[in-house]
């Protein structure tokens, strides 16, 4: 018969592929369960209020038109719904595909069973497949994996959340219109069961059997599979556990399969008492907590409570004397085993001869250890007992008492067993690899000894007092030949023959009185020794390694091991070299990967890599978590060192008087520093002792592990310091900003110095790590803050700054800002608010408008540089850009609402436009015409002013940031600054040359050079924020004349001061000149340059017309508004870096030259 798993056996390959896919689906479900968007849980009030109207459960399907109608009625809900779709469609699609694959899995399994039934596979029926060893394993696994999928989904992704995600996917994707979509079936299968994994939650009635029966499966198939599992040892594991008391451990994998499959046939659990008694007697006579898949544990006492037959059958196991007997037995086993294992682990104890002579003894010890560890870990686990269930609590307390449970002792036994197992495996692997060479070498040695003895008895080779003996000569030659003829490939015959040869050599010594000659005796003894070694060597079988692999399975502890993390970390803190022992435990845990990967590998599935990566990644994550105690302890010591260096140790001057030496010695403090530094070095050594290890398919390099751990701890501490240090009280007078920045700078300097100090002791690049991680923290927080302004948000798993190994912590927001960078930015905006402060450009200083006291100045930005570095300034700059974009977008909406939808306003503007055309002319009776137009549009200006001033204020801040960045770049990195300036000028020259002569080269649109150089220029402050285009715009009617009117409306609020320029006339009616100019400049910059030309022409016309009118008076004087308008033009060309001729085209140059003197 063809091998069931052969590639040409279609029947075997079909079921193998199904089972392989089942394991891959479970891995995907486990992976995705960590990425459920929290918004679908609707846990906190903010989410409920914001998204409650757009997230629906399955009640949506009762009346989709009603729900959609409610959304369409409110444009803001529609907008939120669209934004929500853009942000979540990718992850929703991934979840849907996983859910769909579960449904497809059971459909494919049912189709396979139908094909078997209908005889599609020649000579194969359900019965014949179940008779085949691989066939019955695969059929049992196929149904079991489906059950595990359903349980995993319900445990990891709550029913309500599933429903909301499915409805969201249905609404947002094309699934509703797709004909071949099986959305209905998926929704029926995965609708909420009412189950909750929260502790103390009540179990729904008929759960999980009603859930398992949502897709009908052949009754015959289920009962036949249960029958097989009841009667057979389908994995042949009993041979690896010969002792009867280990039988339940031998059948543990099969027991887990049967436990899950029984839910597909509830009558067995409810009423088949004899069957359940048989099942319990075979699988659960001495255990009631089982692991069903990769460490997912269940307590039969709890889960079988609703089933009469199952509960009754289990009562014998849960009988108090039985529990006491089992727990006491394992207590005794541990007491006797632990010293034995520790003896084996002593240096030099496990020698090759000892191992080869004691294989059964060593394997028995390993078996007993693993069985004891398994029973105790499962039956004492907190997760296995519901604390709200009194009976479960009693059983747990009894187990803990009777087994004398001590988690530290159990953990130590696990460590020692893993180490023992690891050493034994390594020895066996080496012996197996050398087996043939050694055997041949012993054979050669033995044969040569016999040949030499034959030569001795020939009389040719002189040996003291050995007479010539032809019989013995011939006999020894024959023995040499026999030894030489032994064949390695036929180990059974060779072994038998070797035993006979040993006997013959013993007999020849006795019969021929050869004992009298010591040298001959020695030759014979040596040969016997070599023959014995040959027997030992031929007995080194791979079966021993296979048995060790089966016995050493630790997959049941995949999740439970986490409960020992604190003990592991405490052990490492006390003794860092403990890491070497932990390595063996992690490798033992890695063997759990064999379970899900076996079938995937057999099927040559492409899923092998992704599933291996998932489980290996989870294990490596756990290894990192355990070893994180080393960086944590290092940083604790480091904090003490920095405290001593900063506060206690006085810096030694370059010149020192001899008699002052004792004062500066400070031996106690320096000894303390040395002691702490030594502790840091020991921790480093501890982690580096763990050799490079392959955990699953991921290579773990201890040096990298240490560096990542140090980075993680640094990130955690710096992020916490930034979060706590930059929280501001908006009511505080004066602002807390500068004091807090100074404190922050001191804190960051402490971290920086400590890193500088530590780098040589732990062999890392301190400055490089510091810069990389601080920039990552700042950039990540800026990204999170900017998400508030983005429609399509950047999720953590999409962020280039967030990392799974070195995560940046997220903190709940304390105000409207998401992060510390947002709080810092808003505090700066608050204290430089143009409504309460006046910015004097020549001084780079903000003054309070009422008290005229200085509020802050450009030193603020050097303080930010000291505390957050250039990354912080750069991040602040990026955030201000987003804020400006938002303000400009709001402004466009405001313009459309106030101007373009107001008919009377448009009439006023149209009339004014007629009067001022042509702009080169002069408006007669200008004062009256302008004031009438301003009066009619009066309502518009407050909101307009607010928007312009906000943009202007942020542009002032951006200029200051650019100045600080440019200064520090030229100071700290003059070569970079010079290179960037030259490069920038060269590119601009090339672009200008290209526009004059298109045959010359120029960067094309798809070339990223311009984007990359822009990022560098902005980081170095070599840019002008006022030239930036923030938004794309369309033509707006009346735009130049509206801005002109707005400016003229604001001029009466301002007055000219020879020393300060334009200042606010009345603090009660606040306005700040520089933000006003920069706001208008930025706004006009977003549109076509002809708008700016028209706007400047209108101001020129206003100046000329007003001067014309004022000179006709008896005492001509220059009106204040004209001075304001002239100042505006002067400042406009100054800030925009335009040539003066631009405004001189509209106003005669002598007026510009003289207006200050006239005033």
From Swiss-Prot:
Pfam families in alphabetical order: Strumpellin (PF10266)
Keyword terms, alphabetized: Endosome, Protein transport, Transport
Main location: other
Recorded GO CC terms: early endosome; WASH complex
Keyword match GTP-binding: no
Protein localization: Early endosome
GO biological process, one term: protein transport
Biological role stated in the UniProt entry: Acts at least in part as component of the WASH complex which seems to regulate washc1 nucleation-promoting factor (NPF) activity and is required for its membrane targeting during endosomal sorting.
Subunit structure and binding partners: Component of the WASH complex.
Family: Belongs to the strumpellin family.
Protein name: WASH complex subunit 5
Annotated gene: washc5
């Amino acid at each position: 018969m063809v091998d069931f798993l052969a590639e040409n056996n279609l029947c075997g390959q079909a079921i193998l592929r199904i089972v392989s896919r089942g394991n891959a689906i479970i891995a995907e479900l486990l992976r995705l369960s960590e990425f459920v968007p929290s918004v679908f849980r609707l846990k906190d009030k903010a989410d409920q209020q914001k998204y409650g109207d757009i997230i629906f459960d399955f009640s949506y399907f009762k009346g989709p038109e009603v729900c959609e109608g409610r959304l369409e009625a409110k444009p803001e809900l529609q907008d939120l719904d669209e934004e929500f779709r853009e942000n979540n469609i990718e992850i929703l699609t991934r979840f849907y595909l996983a859910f769909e694959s579960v449904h497809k899995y059971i459909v494919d399994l049912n189709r396979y069973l139908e094909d078997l039934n209908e005889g599609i596979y020649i000579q194969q029926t359900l019965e014949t497949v179940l008779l085949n060893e691989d066939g019955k394993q695969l059929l049992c696994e196929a149904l079991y994996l489906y059950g595990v999928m359903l349980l995993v989904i319900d445990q990891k992704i709550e029913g309500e959340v599933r429903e909301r995600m499915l409805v969201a996917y249905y609404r947002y994707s094309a699934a509703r219109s797709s004909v071949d979509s099986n959305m209905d079936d998926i929704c029926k299968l995965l609708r909420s069961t009412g189950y909750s994994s929260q502790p103390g939650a009540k179990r729904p009635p008929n759960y999980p059997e009603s859930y398992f029966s949502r897709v009908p499966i052949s009754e015959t198939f289920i009962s036949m599979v249960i029958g097989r599992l009841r009667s057979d040892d389908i994995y042949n594991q009993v041979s690896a556990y010969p002792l009867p008391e280990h039988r339940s451990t031998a059948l543990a994998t099969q027991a887990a399969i049967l436990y899950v499959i029984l839910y597909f046939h509830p009558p067995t659990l409810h009423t088949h008492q004899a069957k359940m008694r048989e099942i319990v007697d075979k699988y659960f006579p001495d255990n009631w907590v089982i692991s069903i898949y990769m460490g997912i544990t269940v307590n039969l006492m709890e889960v079988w409570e609703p089933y009469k037959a199952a509960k009754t059958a289990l009562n014998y196991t849960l009988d108090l004397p039985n529990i006491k007997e089992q727990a006491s037995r394992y207590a005794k086993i541990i007491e006797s085993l632990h010293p034995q294992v520790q003896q084996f682990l002593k240096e030099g104890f496990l020698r090759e001869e000892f191992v080869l002579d004691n294989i059964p003894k060593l394997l028995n010890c390993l078996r007993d250890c693993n069985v004891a560890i398994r029973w105790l870990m499962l039956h004492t686990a907190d997760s296995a007992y519901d604390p709200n269930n009194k009976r479960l609590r009693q059983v747990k307390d009894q187990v803990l008492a009777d087994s004398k449970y001590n988690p530290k002792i159990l953990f130590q036994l696990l460590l020692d067993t893993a180490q023992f197992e690891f050493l034994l495996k390594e020895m066996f692997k080496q012996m197996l690899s050398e087996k043939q060479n050694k055997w041949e070498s012993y054979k050669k040695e033995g044969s040569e000894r016999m040949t030499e003895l034959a030569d001795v008895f020939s009389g040719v080779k002189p040996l003291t007092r050995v007479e010539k003996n032809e019989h013995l000569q011939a006999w020894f030659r024959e023995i040499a030949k026999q030894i030489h003829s032994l064949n390695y490939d036929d180990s059974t015959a060779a072994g038998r023959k070797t035993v006979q040869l040993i006997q013959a050599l013993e007999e020849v010594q006795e019969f021929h009185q050869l004992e009298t000659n010591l040298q001959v005796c020695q030759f014979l003894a040596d040969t016997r020794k070599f023959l014995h070694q040959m027997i030992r060597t031929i007995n080194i079988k791979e079966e021993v390694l296979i048995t060790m692999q089966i016995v050493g399975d630790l997959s049941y502890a995949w999740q439970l091991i986490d409960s020992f993390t604190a003990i592991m970390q405490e052990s490492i803190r006390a003794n860092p070299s403990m890491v070497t022992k932990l390595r063996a435990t992690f490798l033992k845990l890695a063997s759990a990967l064999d379970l899900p990967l076996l079938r995937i590998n057999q099927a040559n599935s492409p899923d092998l890599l992704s599933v291996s990566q998932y489980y290996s990644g989870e294990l490596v994550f756990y290894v990192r978590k355990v070893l994180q105690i080393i960086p944590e302890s290092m940083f604790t010591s480091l904090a003490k060192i920095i405290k001593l260096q900063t506060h206690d140790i006085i810096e030694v001057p370059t010149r020192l008087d001899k008699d002052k030496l004792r004062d500066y010695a400070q031996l106690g403090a320096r000894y303390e520093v040395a002691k702490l530094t030594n502790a840091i070095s020991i921790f480093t050594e501890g982690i580096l002792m763990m050799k490079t290890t392959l955990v699953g398919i991921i290579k773990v390099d201890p040096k990298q592990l240490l560096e990542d751990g140090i980075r993680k701890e640094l990130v955690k501490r710096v992020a916490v310091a930034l979060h706590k240090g930059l929280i501001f009280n908006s009511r505080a007078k004066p602002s807390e900003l500068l004091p807090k920045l100074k404190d922050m700078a001191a804190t960051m300097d402490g971290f920086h110095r400590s890193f500088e100090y530590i780098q040589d002791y732990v062999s890392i690049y301190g400055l490089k790590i510091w810069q990389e991680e601080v920039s990552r923290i700042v950039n990540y927080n800026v990204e999170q803050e900017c998400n508030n302004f983005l429609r399509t948000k950047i999720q953590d798993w999409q962020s280039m700054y967030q990392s799974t190994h070195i995560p940046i912590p997220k903190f709940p927001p304390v105000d409207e800002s998401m992060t510390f960078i947002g709080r810092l930015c808003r505090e700066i905006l608050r204290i430089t608010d143009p409504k309460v402060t006046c910015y004097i450009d020549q001084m780079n200083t903000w003054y309070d408008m009422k008290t005229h006291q200085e509020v802050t100045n450009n030193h603020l930005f050097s303080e930010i540089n000291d505390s957050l570095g250039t990354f912080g300034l750069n991040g602040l700059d990026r955030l201000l850009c987003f804020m400006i974009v938002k303000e400009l977008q709001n402004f466009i909406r405001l313009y459309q609402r106030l101007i373009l939808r107001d008919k009377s306003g448009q009439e006023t503007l149209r009339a004014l436009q007629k009067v001022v055309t042509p702009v080169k002319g002069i408006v007669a009776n200008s004062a009256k015409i302008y004031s009438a137009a301003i009066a009619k549009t009066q309502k518009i200006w407050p909101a307009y002013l607010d928007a312009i001033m906000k943009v202007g204020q942020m542009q002032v801040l951006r200029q200051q940031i650019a100045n600080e960045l440019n200064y520090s770049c030229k100071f700290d990195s003059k070569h970079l600054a010079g290179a960037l300036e030259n490069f920038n000028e060269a590119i601009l020259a090339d672009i200008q040359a290209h526009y004059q002569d298109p045959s010359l080269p120029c960067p094309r649109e798809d070339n990223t050079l311009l984007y990359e150089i822009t990022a560098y220029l902005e980081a170095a402050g070599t840019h002008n924020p006022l030239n930036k285009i923030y938004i794309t715009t369309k033509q707006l009617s009346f735009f130049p004349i509206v801005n002109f009117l707005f400016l003229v409306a604001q001029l009466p609020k301002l007055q000219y001061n020879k020393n300060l320029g334009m200042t606010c006339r009345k603090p009660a009616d606040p306005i700040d000149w520089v933000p006003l100019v920069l706001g208008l400049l930025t706004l006009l910059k977003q549109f076509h340059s002809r708008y700016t030309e028209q706007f400047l022409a209108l101001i020129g016309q206003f100046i000329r017309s007003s001067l014309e009118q004022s000179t006709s008076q008896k005492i001509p004087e220059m009106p204040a508004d004209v001075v304001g308008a002239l100042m505006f033009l002067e400042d406009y060309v100054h800030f925009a870096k335009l040539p003066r001729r631009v405004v001189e085209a509209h106003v005669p140059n002598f007026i510009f030259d003289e207006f200050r003197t006239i005033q």
